[in-house]
Amino acid sequence: MSSVVVVGTQWGDEGKGKITDFLSENAEVIARYQGGNNAGHTIKFDGVTYKLHLIPSGIFYKEKACVIGNGMVVDPKALITELAYLHERNVSTDNLRISNRAHVILPYHLKLDEVEEERKGANKIGTTKKGIGPAYMDKAARIGIRIADLLDRDVFAEKLERNLEEKNRLLEKMYETEGFKIEDILDEYYEYGQQIKKYVCDTSVVLNDALDEGRRVLFEGAQGVMLDIDQGTYPFVTSSNPVAGGVTIGSGVGPTKIQHVVGVSKAYTTRVGDGPFPTELKDEIGDQIREVGREYGTTTGRPRRVGWFDSVVVRHARRVSGITDLSLNSIDVLTGIETLKICVAYRYKGEVIEEFPASLKALAECEPVYEEMPGWTEDITGAKTLSDLPENARHYLERVSQLTGIPLSIFSVGPDRSQTNVIRSVYRAN
């Protein structure tokens, strides 16, 4: 048995898709366990760039099972669109498996997401408006519709009718906007269910059987630890648990079967959406990092906020996710910056603190304590080993590993999978 979890250590967009794709080569099953099509993965495979939002990155390996776990929320319309996108590019999806226990995103979830963000105005969360939050709300309220329900027309119709009574009251009375008729949704979404029916099964059985047979299973997290609903910068978070612990709930695999957790990070920090960001750069260096790193959201197209590497954030991620291995991406983006900074702690009300605060008010008042390091000007995009890197780049990586307390296992010097380099295998026995 060999199981590896890939999690983002920051606010998402760390390059998890690329690392998952890279690690998928040596895995036999690849599974997502939380989130929905609010995630965005950009993957280069055989020289072609693909952008996925819902389907796991391992889909490009037709001999490997690719799982959408029970902890995900699935927009059937978006899924059909993504399947068509892959089919048009001659990518087989016969290896896809979808949990019959995953919850379904319906049009009223999308509408509620949109109007609630508008209502909040300046206090908005910065949601992708994909209906993720409202779908998870229904799940917690025990009125959600699952994939298994979607496949049974009578059950789907009964639950949809019940839900529309409540949702329409909410839309019309509170938000003063038009609701939905059952005929607006029933036939269209039931048909979507029929189109994906061949992929649907009990994915917990698929995953546990694979582990019991000694096969390598890779769990792909979406977003990042700082967007986790429990451990992140609440309320500026997603509605699920991207932390490694989310695997057990969102995939139906017990915690004793998880061996290694790979924390993926950029060599700097980015964030999409609102909320405090202690190391944010609003100067020319920030603009340079954004443009060189092409820091625009895969899902939203929004420019990402950028900042210096924050070891306080990544230490927090290490602790709450049990991270055993660090994968550091986008090192090449920092090339040409004369002096680099790493946040080693925060200064709050005159005191130096080394742990991430729970209070957003406190976080907003924190000032980063920086350690400066000399940069490098050499082209590092062809580096294959640590010794290929210039001395200053190597020292930067070593310092990041020291400050976060996570051994460096993978480093990346460009967007292509060939620019991803392994220092030690994450599939090791111990």
UniProtKB/Swiss-Prot annotation:
Q: What is its main location?
A: cytoplasm
Q: What does the record's cofactor remark say about binding?
A: Binds 1 Mg(2+) ion per subunit.
Spell out the InterPro entries in the cross-references.
Adenylosuccin_syn_GTP-bd, Adenylosuccin_syn_Lys_AS, Adenylosuccinate_synth_dom1, Adenylosuccinate_synth_dom2, Adenylosuccinate_synth_dom3, Adenylosuccinate_synthetase, P-loop_NTPase
Keyword line: Cytoplasm, GTP-binding, Ligase, Magnesium, Metal-binding, Nucleotide-binding, Purine biosynthesis
Q: Which reaction does it catalyse?
A: IMP + L-aspartate + GTP = N(6)-(1,2-dicarboxyethyl)-AMP + GDP + phosphate + 2 H(+)
Q: What is its EC number?
A: 6.3.4.4
The pathway entry for this protein reads as:
Purine metabolism; AMP biosynthesis via de novo pathway; AMP from IMP: step 1/2
Which GO cellular component term is one of those annotated?
cytoplasm
Record's SUPFAM superfamilies? Answer: P-loop containing nucleoside triphosphate hydrolases
**Catalytic residues of the enzyme:** D13, H41
Q: Where does GTP bind?
A: 12-18, 40-42, 304, 330-332, 412-414
Q: Where is the signal peptide?
A: none
**GO BP term, example:** IMP metabolic process
Q: What class of enzyme is it?
A: ligase
| Localization | Cytoplasm
Molecular function per GO: adenylosuccinate synthase activity; GTP binding; magnesium ion binding
Q: Which residues bind substrate?
A: T298, T299, T300, G301, R302, P303, R304
Give the residues the record marks as binding Mg(2+): D13, G40
Name any one Pfam family assigned in the record.
Adenylsucc_synt
Its quaternary structure? Homodimer.
Tell me the HAMAP family matching this sequence. Adenylosucc_synth
- Could you say which protein family the record assigns here? Belongs to the adenylosuccinate synthetase family.
This molecule's function is given as: Plays an important role in the de novo pathway of purine nucleotide biosynthesis. Catalyzes the first committed step in the biosynthesis of AMP from IMP.
Check the record and name the PANTHER family matching this protein. Answer: ADENYLOSUCCINATE SYNTHETASE
Question: Which named protein is this?
Answer: Adenylosuccinate synthetase
